[in-house]
C-alpha cells in the first residue's frame, strides 16, 4: 500500500455483519518542497523513517531522480539524506526512492539576476539596469555584472541596491543584451527608436 488514508471493511461471512476501520499509511520518506536561489547552499533534504515509526540510522541508500538523472545518497546517523541542487532557474520535480516507497516534491530555483526589456529614444540618456541578489534574495552590492551587447562586453559594479547600470549609446534598432553573473545569464531586448 502506498502512503495515504484507507478504509478497511471486514465482513463476517456467516452473519453478513460488516465493520469498517480507517487506516493511515505513512510514507517512509519525510520531505518538503524546496525554493532556493540559483547556486546558494540550500540542499534538498529527506529523512527516512524505519518500519517501526522511528528513523533509520546511517548507511541507508536513498535514490533521487531529477530531470531524468538519478543520484544515490546515504543517510547520516539521524536518517537524513541530502542532495545539492545546482540547477538553472526554473521549476523541477524531484522523486525520492527508498525501498518500495517513492515520493515527489517540487524544487523551484529563483534567479539571482533580473532585468527588464528597455525601450528608449536614440541617445535619450536611458540606462539598462540589472538587479543582482545574493543567495538569500537580498541586494548584492559591489559585485561585477557582465553585459554583452553586439558582442561587446562591459563590466559594471552593482550599487548599494544591487543594481548594475549600463549607458546605452547605440543606433536605432533592436538589440539583445545578455547580463551575466557567476554562471547565471539572462537575456533582454533593447529597442531604440530614432
PLM region spans:
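Solvent-exposed beta-strand/loop surfaces, strongest in extracytoplasmic domains of secreted
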Residues: 1-194
Amino acid at each position: 500500500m502506498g502512503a495515504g488514508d484507507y478504509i478497511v471493511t471486514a465482513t463476517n461471512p456467516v452473519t453478513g455483519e460488516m465493520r469498517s476501520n480507517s487506516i493511515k499509511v505513512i510514507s517512509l520518506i519525510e520531505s518538503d518542497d524546496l525554493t532556493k536561489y540559483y547556486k546558494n547552499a540550500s540542499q534538498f533534504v529527506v529523512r527516512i523513517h524505519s518500519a517501526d515509526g522511528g528513523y533509520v540510522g546511517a548507511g541507508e541508500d536513498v535514490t533521487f531522480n531529477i530531470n531524468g538523472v538519478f543520484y544515490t545518497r546515504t543517510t547520516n546517523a539521524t536518517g537524513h539524506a541530502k542532495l545539492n541542487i545546482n540547477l538553472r532557474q526554473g521549476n523541477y520535480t524531484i522523486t525520492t526512492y527508498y525501498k518500495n516507497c517513492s515520493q515527489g516534491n517540487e524544487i523551484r530555483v529563483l534567479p539571482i539576476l533580473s532585468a527588464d526589456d528597455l525601450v528608449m529614444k536614440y541617445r535619450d540618456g536611458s540606462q539598462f539596469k540589472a538587479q543582482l541578489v545574493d543567495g538569500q534574495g537580498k541586494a548584492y552590492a559591489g559585485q561585477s555584472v557582465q553585459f554583452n551587447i553586439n558582442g561587446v562586453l562591459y563590466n559594471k559594479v552593482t550599487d548599494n541596491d544591487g543594481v548594475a547600470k549600463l549607458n546605452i549609446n547605440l543606433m536605432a534598432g533592436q538589440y539583445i543584451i545578455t547580463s551575466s553573473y557567476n554562471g547565471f545569464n539572462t537575456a533582454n531586448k533593447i529597442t531604440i527608436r530614432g
